[in-house]
């Protein structure tokens, strides 16, 4: 019988000690998420993790590490969001980024890196038409809370590398 080996990008990059530090930060209710982001930077730097900051959402922080997006939960809702994205990414393909891995508690998720749309691309009528079609297709089966075609949502849209697929 042939054995299949699984690889964890998270466990390759982050020691158990580092994961514990990040977990303690996430569970610290005395620190707001904006400050948690800054503390997360300090922790990653202490452990010599090479990353490029991408940006914050309400409950998570994204950083580019070795060509992948690592989404760090900043609170319990961020942990749930990471697990939810992992659970639903396959049935929602090709309309959402691929989530390759998530820790069981949702602390960190590893996702596909896509090029973000510019505001000009977002406002292009042909692009908006495709976005409406995507929202119609996935909206029939899934509730999508933070995606729309309002200008405040433009950073939630991007292009899959080497394709014209809109995500």
Regions found by a protein language model. Give the residues of each.
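Protein kinase catalytic-loop region centered on the HRD/HxD motif
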Residues: 140-147
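Catalytic activation segment of kinase domains across protein kinase-like and atypical kinase folds
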Residues: 147-167
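ATP-binding glycine-rich loop module of kinase domains
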Residues: 50-97
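Short, surface-exposed coil-to-beta transition loops
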Residues: 57-58, 104, 152-154
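Conserved structural core of kinase catalytic domains
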Residues: 94-135
């Amino acid at each position: 019988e042939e054995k299949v080996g699984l690889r964890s990008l998270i466990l390759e990059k982050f020691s158990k000690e580092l994961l514990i530090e990040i977990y303690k930060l996430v569970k610290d209710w005395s620190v707001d998420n904006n400050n948690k982001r800054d503390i997360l930077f300090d922790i990653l730097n202490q452990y010599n993790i090479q990353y490029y900051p991408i940006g914050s959402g309400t409950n998570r922080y994204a950083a580019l590490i070795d060509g992948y997006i690592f989404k760090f939960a900043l609170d319990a809702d961020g942990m749930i969001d990471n697990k939810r994205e992992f659970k639903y990414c396959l049935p929602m393909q090709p309309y959402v980024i691929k989530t390759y891995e998530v820790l069981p508690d949702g602390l960190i998720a590893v996702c596909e890196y896509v090029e973000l749309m510019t505001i000009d691309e977002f406002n292009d009528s042909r692009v908006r038409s495709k976005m409406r079609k995507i929202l119609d297709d996935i909206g029939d089966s899934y509730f999508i809370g933070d995606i729309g075609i309002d200008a405040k949502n433009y950073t939630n849209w991007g292009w899959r590398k080497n394709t014209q697929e809109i995500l």
